[in-house]
Amino acid sequence: FAKALAEVIKATPVVTTATDVNKLFAVDEWAARNNMIINSMKAAKDFAAALLDGQEVGLFTDYPIISALPRQIVLKDKGITGLAITKNRNVKPFDVTVQLWPRNIYLGIGCRRGTTLESIETLVLPKLKELGIDLRTIVGVASVDLKKDEAGLFDFVAKYNWEISFFTAE
């Protein structure tokens, strides 16, 4: 918030968190830069406290690692404190797990002509829950271009403020 406000009023933000002062990995800033949702700010604070205490913390990820890990963070799938970068909110490999959920999921939805918003929700929402997918990680919905006039589909997408894309059947 301080950085956004400073930009609006043309000021220099001064952010002094313990991780910043000690030049340690700041999970909240990293998540924001990478379009991820933090499941629990309490867990994020506990994670930062572990870093400040000099502890090694773990990283579990469903995604490839494409750069060097920050100091004190090691790749592992269990331990006391760590990050889990995953689309599945049920994955908690550490006693204190900071789940980072990338906003990168698109739903493919087909429906019969005249299908209502409520009917789509009745089918889609329980399936997402079963798969452990948080609604905040969904970016949009895709469907075949034959469905571009389906009010129920548009109502569903609008309700959750998602994008919608249509593709040809080819």
Question: Predicted segments — roles?
Answer:
Residues 1-67:
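Conserved anion/nucleotide-ligand pocket segment
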Residues 124-138:
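Phosphate/pyrophosphate-binding loops at sites that engage ATP/ADP/AMP, CoA/4′-phosphopantetheine
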